[in-house]
Amino acid sequence: MSEIPEHPRPRRLAHWINPTGARKVHSLIDKVYQKKNLEMAWEKVRANKGAGGVDGQSVADFELQRDEQLDRLHRELRDDVYRPQPVKQVPIPKAGKPGEWRNLGIPTIFDRVCQQALLNRLEPIFEPEFDDASFGYRRGRSPHGALRKVWKEIEGGSQWIVDADLRDYFGSVQHDKLLALVARQVADGRVLRLIGAMLKAGSCEGRHYTSSEQGTPQGAVVSPLLSNILLTPFDREMRGRGYRLTRFADDWVVTCETARQAKEALVAARHILSALGVELHPQKTRIVHVRYGFEFLGYKIKQGAKPLHLPASKIRSGVRNGALYAYPRDRSIQRLMDQVRRLTRRKVPLTTVELIRELNPTLAGWGRYYRRAHVRRLFHRLDAWIVRRLWSHRFKRWRNVGWKRLPESLLYGEYGLVNLIGLIPSIAASRSAST
């Protein structure tokens, strides 16, 4: 695994926040409500965009009153009268699970700026405390870094996998345990009360208010950091016992050399997580050999014994017995196809150029995430299917006339449709060299 790049700015911030190097930071709230910090927080919230919360105020609305809003937030935090509003609960479909939904908690823009300002000051304090096993929501780390680590461990002989899932992690976080862990590094009582108020702000769905005695809302700016804080003792304890843990937020695996070691690792994980108030999902936690495959961060990783079940294509992507392969999991493929279907329905009142403009961000993001996997056949098939969807939308029927009036050369050339197979590094390099 490549070295994680160092970033001097967080170290400088950490020194400024805690110049004495004391184990705990005693004075932090004044650095949270510092006007420059609030301005930086607002710029981050504005760049991320997103919908408004329960007060109905949008990012554009906030921007019209930017100075007044930031002054108000500064005063409320300084005078210790700030109170967060409930988050707006928005049900969204679970990826790859038709008919199943999860709630996304959306704070108001005002509260989002406050959370980002708090995050700006907490992150430099806690980042040095996080374990090397943790890859989620950390500067210089990524899902692909986590996947590379797991891949190398499997290639090194650790082929038994503890494939685990946490039961309703974000919804079951115990506030007292989380705040106790924050208090190990932060002794500023006002900051601790501020975090507690954010956690207990509750939620609104329509006009129905629900109090929050546990959990941290998915969608809150500070939730990823808080999730890492809560699970850091788990990371340290597992690695301290010699287990090869890799974690990205609440998604984690342990690679082991034997089935017995994997069973012991699972027992240890269950015990450590229980002490943190976190449960494993009994139906979604298993021990498996890599030859049978497991899923991690949207990928299916499997040792080849048979050809992968991918549709035939003119582009060869064979599988050798005993070799290790990674490809998008079925739910990820289905989710992409559902998005394309929705955008290319025949009744969608857009021109082909407008459709491509809508499709491209989805195709580019999905393709770049999976382009280093074993996806030549899959990308080739998806490219052909997407072109046929565009033909169907344009000519209102599934007939082989589209290629005459709307050839692929026009779609990929003048119209700029993202070509998935062209995102694969070796193919992209070959095409670049030939032009």
Can you say where each PLM-predicted feature lies in the sequence?
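Non-catalytic, polymerase-adjacent accessory regions of viral genome-replication enzymes
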Residues: M1-D67, D71
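Conserved polymerase palm-domain catalytic core
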Residues: E76-P91, E129-G293
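Short, solvent-exposed helix-loop connector elements
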Residues: N103, S211-T216, A323-Y325, R341-L355, ...
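Duplex nucleic acid-engaging cores and interfaces of nucleic-acid transaction enzymes
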Residues: I109-F110, C114, W151
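A conserved non-catalytic segment of reverse transcriptases
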Residues: K200, L276-T351
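A glycine-rich phosphate-binding loop feature that marks nucleotide/adenosyl-phosphate handling sites
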Residues: T285-G293, L359-T362, F379-V387, W403-L410
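Extended C-terminal regions of large enzymes
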Residues: W385-R389, R394-T435
